[in-house]
Amino acid sequence: MVNQNMNTPEPIPAHAPHVPLTDYYQTEQDRQAYLRQMFDNTAADYDRIEAMLAWGTGSRYRHQALIRGGLKAGMKVLDVGVGTGLVAAQACILTGDAALVTGVDPSPGMMAASKLPDTMVLMEGRAESLPFPDNHFDFLSMGYALRHISDLSVAFAEFERVLKPGGRLCLLEITRPQNRFWRWLLKNYMRGVIPLLTRFVSRQKDNATLWRYFWDSIEACVPPEQVLTTLSATGLTQVKRHLEVGIFSEYQAVKAGQPGSGRTEKSRT
């Protein structure tokens, strides 16, 4: 066993979605604990604040994004970073059976605040180590959680592993606008206006911090081209990005192979 010097900085993951945001945490271990606590603390108010942020249009957008990603009735779905279930709720509608949809998230508080159907399965877990067998799902979604994982390569390899051959991937994320004016506008909206509005929703101070953190992680996130390259490196095919109104990125991909050709294997522990 190698003894690590206590003063040695913790290495940054090889394909981290962004540099450490030291205004909030110092190390990768700190980041995971910080995010879990912040999401747990803000779970009760999350949906109401999100509805304000999106002006009530979020459900319709998520519904259409999943359709563009290829989600159809009868598909077996995994929603990674399920949170309070905003994306999973639309997946339940589109599949026609909530029992076909599984959600996984590292924040038990967020999942406890969800209003999802009782027949949908919710499990605690992380994108980098999914507790499911190989070749298990027809469709994998993730809504606005790409910035919160530790290593894109590790997580994307897990996504590819649990998808069946021919299975589809749809990752939704907010991307920093290229236009300087729109970037300034979105920054001030998320770092200033939304944190101010949270005071009318809740006395929980972490709500304001959460939305400022969201913008800072968006601003620091790796460019879409790097996300696409990392997805392709896992062996996923038909990798592409669809962009809505200049900020909503939809990363889509398909697992190689013909549907029905995969063999379900033992899950990782």
What are these model-predicted stretches?
Residues 236-269:
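Core SAM-dependent methyltransferase catalytic element
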Residues 138-152:
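A short SAM/SAH-binding and catalytic strip from SAM-dependent methyltransferases
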Residues 128-139:
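A short acidic, Gly/Pro-enriched loop at the edge of an enzyme's catalytic core
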Residues 78-129:
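Class I SAM-dependent methyltransferase SAM/SAH-binding core
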Residues 167-174:
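Conserved beta-strand signature within the Rossmann-like core of class I S-adenosyl-L-methionine
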Residues 55-73, 90:
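Conserved alpha-helix/loop element of class I SAM-dependent methyltransferases that forms part
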Residues 153-165:
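A short glycine-rich, Lys/Arg-flanked "PGG" loop and its adjoining helix->strand segment in the class I
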Residues 30-34, 176-230:
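C-terminal alpha-helical "lid/dimerization" subdomain adjacent to the S-adenosyl-L-methionine
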